[in-house]
Curated annotation (Swiss-Prot):
Compositionally biased tracts (Polar residues): 1-13
The keyword Cytoplasm appears for this protein: no
Keyword Secreted carried by entry: yes
InterPro entries noted in UniProt: T3SS_HopW1-1/HolPsyAE
Superkingdom of this protein's organism: Bacteria
Disordered, as annotated region: 1-32
Compartments where found: Secreted
Any single Pfam family the record assigns to this protein: HopW1-1
Phylogenetic classification of the source organism: Bacteria, Pseudomonadati, Pseudomonadota, Gammaproteobacteria, Pseudomonadales
Protein name (database record): Effector protein hopAE1
Family note: Belongs to the HopW family.
Organism: Pseudomonas savastanoi pv. phaseolicola (strain 1448A / Race 6) (Pseudomonas syringae pv. phaseolicola (strain 1448A / Race 6))
GO terms under cellular component: extracellular region
Coiled coil ranges: none
Length: 912
């Protein structure tokens, strides 16, 4: 289909249209509908048919919706006020700015909810009621605003299928008698005929798509079901337009459109997008009245149960033992060979998706020659070059885009970096709120960031030895960087090829069989029913995790080590310490305070040492470097070599950021296992360490002062910090509920360790909420369930009431441990995070007020005798004011910020 030459209501440019093209007398005698119809025939612009103008709105739609919501929430609303607000909202929808405001995702559910509320109130209100007319006017205003909203969203979509519905709705809102008017009111049918012909072609395409791919099209149209009710008037409107049309070609186009539209109405009825079959006739002249209730999306009982069940299983079984996960699709995309995309090329890749280039246009771009790329230009040599070809083809005139494509190209926000607006917008929306166009954009961004990344990143990492040979760095730093590089390549290899069958099948069963007996034996010999029931629940969950580990192809040695430490180490260590006195029946020793303290200290120290081994090793290295002369490497290397080395590490960080944004956006609409998420988190963390280690070493080599890098913003910081607070409270409560001294000491050490681990996750911006909840489930989950369980048992003591009571209690505890930790962790973390975020926002407001007061005081001081003294103090402490700004803005609303490359302080000596 040829691109339409009639300008649609795109976001880039909207026409300014006069109410009518006739003289002043004619205008004064026209109704608003006639004026809109005349303007539409004169311009051929869809938006004009709905009365849209370029005038600025007198009010803001967001404030109007809020005011309307508050008024309706009152016990006795003022229906006169409601009617005025609704009328104002309808008027805002006729302006260009208001048109776009109503089309936003935030206002879509709000407007529909208000319309439903008013419609139901009107249906319940007697016609003789004093407020009936006001409420009726309110409903009419809301329906008008809803119409503008729906048409704006339909025309904003790149798909011609959605625009077909907007074209047909336009024809139902014209005045047919205006076509029979004498010139000069209607001087030409050219634009009108072209509009009808385009609508016919789009409607035919929509019919074909409804027959071939009904699910996708129905999903696209379902949110507009209430507005589509106006199509019930379409047969009568087309008949009236045909009868009044004075142009023979235009009449033929209208008749052909009526046939295609009739088939469309039947298809819409079959898919429940129109409410009642008996009131829709495709015969000319039979136009049923509008006003039916909107058709809401419906799922069958079976579909609803399957959807709810799938979500619950995913929550309970994030390792993927039973739950259907979407790892395969993301892995397949990452494993697909494709060139690495630079930021500019990624933007162009998205252009290609959003512009919907025809095959002829793609061939033109593909055949456009590129200038010669130097060998050292990694991006130009290994990138796909679509961006450069697209620009060159447009510049030399070989590629001609339609008006719609140009509008999309101008409106497309850059998605080349993780901080781009389009990425942030998609990340901040829940999956259910994503529009069809946003889902298309999401898929394109995931593909651009993920496709071919595994091969490209590994190939890039293989160049590191050659790069380091030009770096001038000392040998110990090179070894450390090579070790980090090896760790990343090993993880990339697992993602590319999967883990060995041996590591998947043998490791987790061996851990369960070898490590579970000792704690269980200690618990049963000591006859501590509370403790033994908790271990039954703990190891049952380990068995479920074991199934997930064995079935997941990404279960490598690192995954098994993490699983063993998180699920076995603390339990086995604590029971190993108390095993000898337990089996020897030395109750006196077990109840001594000193033994309990010694057990807690030994267990806690060993646990913290094992889980913080890397930090401890790094601290020893730092201390050693401080005590001895440190080799900083060659301070003077060629500038060309230095630039090549810096380029290599920057590209490495770019790979990590691409992988992260692909994963985050993919998870907006899909589910991946905790195992895959852990693998990707590990890569991100190691990449950050890799980059940071190089920056420090390079600055020391050159004898420069390392500038403070910008901290990556962490959108999950407050929710993760909420999990830390929850972990601490659970540990304290559990210690209070334990009866024996050993139990108190054991859970005290366990609580300190859990808090330290959750705090490390909270402070790491590479760790997202899914990873934090995964660790919470593994190390705190049982403690969470035990707290409530032992609290109930403290009242009824059912665990000590025979085998039946013990078995029932253990079964309940096991079931709770399998299901609750993940959900409770997410909910509690989110709630605590909101509270912390609120307190921080209040703190920022107080900080701003304090700064304003300080500024006023500073103005006063600067004019007083103290001015010179204050100036001297500020000179002595140059970072005082800037430091406050850094603290206030440490965690803001931005999603991800890349580590800034250090800007070395200028020094004369040591320049490379």
């Amino acid at each position: 289909m040829m691109p339409s030459q009639i300008t649609r209501s795109s976001h880039s440019s909207l026409p300014e249209v006069a109410p009518a093209s006739g003289d002043a007398t004619g205008v004064s005698e026209q109704t608003p509908q006639q004026a809109r119809t005349v303007a539409f025939f004169s311009s051929g612009e869809l938006a004009v048919a709905f009365g849209r103008t370029s005038a600025a709105p007198e009010q803001d739609s967001v404030r109007l919706l809020s005011a309307l919501q508050r008024e309706l929430d009152k016990q006795h609303p003022s229906w006169h006020t409601v009617a005025q607000l609704c009328q104002s909202l309808a008027e805002v929808g006729t302006t260009e700015q208001g048109w776009h405001q109503l089309a936003s995702e935030d206002q879509l559910p709000a407007l529909r909810e208000l319309l439903d509320r008013c419609t139901h109130r009107l249906a319940d209100m007697p016609a003789a009621h004093a407020s009936h007319d006001s409420l009726s006017q309110a409903c009419e205003g809301l329906r008008t605003a809803r119409l503008h909203q729906s048409v704006a969203r339909l025309t904003a979509r790149p798909s011609s299928l959605a625009r077909a519905m907007a074209d047909l709705l336009t024809l139902t809102h014209l005045d047919p008698e205006t076509l029979g008017a004498e010139p000069p009111v209607i001087s030409s049918y050219t634009l009108f005929s072209h509009f009808v012909r385009t609508a016919k072609q789009r409607t035919a395409d929509l019919n074909d798509s409804l027959q071939r791919q009904p699910d996708a099209v129905v999903s696209l149209l379902r949110s507009h079901a209430d507005t589509l009710n106006d199509l019930e008037m379409l047969p009568g409107a087309l008949q009236a337009l045909t009868e009044n049309c004075q142009d023979a070609p235009a009449r033929n186009e209208l008749r052909e459109l009526a046939e295609v539209a009739g088939a469309l109405l039947q298809l819409l009825l079959e898919h429940d997008l129109l409410p009642r079959l008996e009131e829709i006739s495709i015969e000319p002249g039979e136009a049923p009245a509008p006003g039916h209730e909107p058709a809401e999306p419906r799922l069958t009982t079976r579909q609803a149960l399957l959807k709810v069940g799938g979500n619950l299983v995913r929550k309970f079984d994030a390792y993927g033992a039973l739950a259907p996960m979407d790892d395969k699709a993301l892995l397949a995309l990452m494993r697909t060979p494709a060139p690495h995309l630079s930021p500019d090329q990624m933007h162009a890749f998205l252009n290609k998706h959003v512009l919907h280039l025809t095959q002829e246009q793609r061939d033109i771009v593909s055949n456009t020659p590129l200038p010669f790329a130097p060998e050292e230009d990694i991006e130009a040599r290994y990138g796909m070059g679509f961006d450069e070809k697209l620009r060159l083809a447009l510049a030399n005139g070989s590629l001609v885009l339609s008006e719609e494509q140009l509008a999309r190209l101008g409106d497309l926000p850059s998605a080349a970096t993780t901080t781009s607006d389009v990425v942030q917008t998609l990340l901040e929306k829940p999956s259910s709120a994503l529009s069809e166009a946003e889902r298309d954009m999401l898929g394109a961004i995931v593909q651009a960031n993920a496709q071919g990344q595994l091969d490209a990143w590994r190939a890039h990492n293989e160049q590191l030895p050659a790069v380091l040979s030009r770096s001038g760095l000392p040998s110990d730093v090179k070894d450390e960087l090579l070790s980090l590089n090896k760790s990343m390549n090993a993880e990339l290899g697992t993602l590319k090829n999967g883990a060995s069958l041996k590591s998947r099948v043998l490791a987790s069963p061996a851990m369960l069989l070898a490590l579970a007996p000792l704690p269980l034996a200690v618990a049963f010999v000591s006859k501590d029913n509370s403790y033994s029931s908790s271990l039954v629940a703990h190891f049952t969950k380990n068995a479920v995790f074991m199934a997930g580990l064995m079935m997941n192809e990404l279960t490598n040695a690192r995954t098994n080590v993490d699983h063993g430490l998180n699920r076995y180490f603390v339990t086995v260590l604590a029971n190993a310490i108390v095993a000898q006195p337990t089996f020897a029946r030395n109750e006196h020793l077990l109840e001594q305070v000193g033994f309990g303290i010694a057990t807690a200290v030994a267990s806690g120290a060993a646990t913290l040492g094992v889980f913080n081994r890397e930090s401890i090793v790094a601290a020893f290295k730092l201390a050693k470097s401080k005590l001895s002369r440190q080799d900083t490497g060659n301070a003077r290397i060629p500038q060309e070599d230095h630039l090549a080395v810096v380029k290599h590490f920057d590209v490495s960080e770019h790979f990590a950021q691409q992988m992260k944004v692909a994963t985050e956006l993919y998870k907006q609409d899909k589910s991946i296992t905790d195992i895959m998420n852990s693998s990707l988190t590990y890569l991100g963390t190691k990449s950050s360490e890799f980059q940071a280690r190089f920056e420090v070493a390079d600055a020391l080599r050159a004898g420069l002062q390392l500038a403070e890098g910008e901290r990556k913003a962490d959108p999950d910081f407050y929710t993760k910090l909420g999990l830390v607070a929850l972990t601490a409270s659970i540990g304290a409560a559990l210690v209070m509920l334990m009866k024996s001294m050993v139990g108190k000491a054991d859970y005290a050490a366990d609580g300190v360790w859990c808090v330290s681990e959750m705090l490390k996750l909270a402070m790491n911006p590479e760790v997202d909420m899914q990873k934090a909840v995964q660790v919470f489930k593994e190390i705190v989950g049982l403690n969470l369930v035990m707290t409530g369980f032992l609290g109930v048992n403290k009242v009824w003591n059912f665990l000590d009431k025979g085998i039946k009571g013990y078995a029932s209690g253990a079964a309940v505890l096991t079931a709770a441990n399998l299901t609750l930790p993940g959900m409770v962790g997410e909910v509690a973390g989110a709630a605590a995070g909101k509270g912390l975020s609120y307190l921080t926002d209040k703190g920022k407001a107080a900080h701003q007020a304090g700064r304003a007061a300080a500024s006023w005081a500073g103005d006063y001081v600067s004019t007083s005798r103290l001015g010179s003294a204050v100036g001297t103090l500020q000179t002595a402490i140059p970072g005082r004011i800037a430091g406050g700004q850094v603290v206030a803005g440490l965690y803001d609303r931005f999603r991800y910020l890349t580590w800034s490359h250090p800007a070395p302080a200028p020094q004369a000596a040591g320049e490379p």
